[in-house]
Swiss-Prot record:
Name of the protein in its database record: Terminase, small subunit
Family the UniProt entry places it in: Belongs to the P22likevirus small terminase family.
Protein role: The terminase small subunit binds to the packaging initiation site and regulates the ATPase activity of the terminase large subunit. The terminase lies at a unique vertex of the procapsid and is composed of two subunits, a small terminase subunit involved in viral DNA recognition (packaging 'pac' sequence), and a large terminase subunit possessing endonucleolytic and ATPase activities. Both terminase subunits heterooligomerize and are docked on the portal protein to form the packaging machine.
Organism: Enterobacteria phage LP7 (Bacteriophage LP7)
UniProt lineage: Viruses, Duplodnaviria, Heunggongvirae, Uroviricota, Caudoviricetes
Region (Disordered): 132-162
Keyword Disulfide bond: no
Length: 162
């Protein structure tokens, strides 16, 4: 059944849109801390085979779970776009920055200690080894003069001309 024409039921609502997920920086920080604690309490498990006196057994080994922004947003039940908007909100930007720094540090430290795959983490963190090559050869005119002089000296040393 359609609403009657000219109705204004929507004006009866006290606010428009859904209520914010986190109404204060403290609420967002508490939720972020819950995620950090969850990551620590829920490691990934790998089955490793061990051999002792000819008997092979498999044992579960706890492995560090990397914190991620995507994991955090899923835990908080917000989208990545919402997280980006929190980053620019004056009241929440400090919490977002701090959470991102904690995630960065956990990944970097885990990779440095070989608890996480260093190649994957380096790519994720935007780290790369830089090799910079610079052509320090002077302009072509000087290079031609130098080559000519080297050739002249070489030929003089070997007793040949041209």
């Amino acid at each position: 059944m359609a609403a009657p024409k000219g109705n204004r039921f929507w004006e009866a609502r006290s606010s428009h849109g859904r209520n914010p997920k986190f109404e204060s920086p403290e609420a967002l920080w508490a939720a972020c801390c819950e995620y950090f604690e969850w990551v620590e309490a829920n490691p990934l498990w790998e089955m490793k085979a061990f051999s002792y006196q000819g008997e092979v057994t498999q044992e579960p080994i706890a492995k560090m779970r990397a914190m991620t922004i995507t994991g955090l947003t899923l835990f908080l039940d917000v989208t990545l776009e919402t997280w980006r908007q929190y980053r620019v909100r004056e009241d929440l930007s400090e919490v977002v920055t701090r959470a991102e720094q904690i995630i960065y540090d956990q990944k970097f430290s885990g990779a440095a200690d070989d608890l996480l795959n260093a190649n994957i983490i380096a790519r994720d963190l935007g780290l790369k080894e830089q090799s910079q090559f610079e052509d320090v050869t002077p302009d072509k005119g000087d290079r031609d003069k130098r080559r000519s002089r080297i050739k002249e000296l070489f030929n003089r040393g070997t007793g040949r001309d041209s």
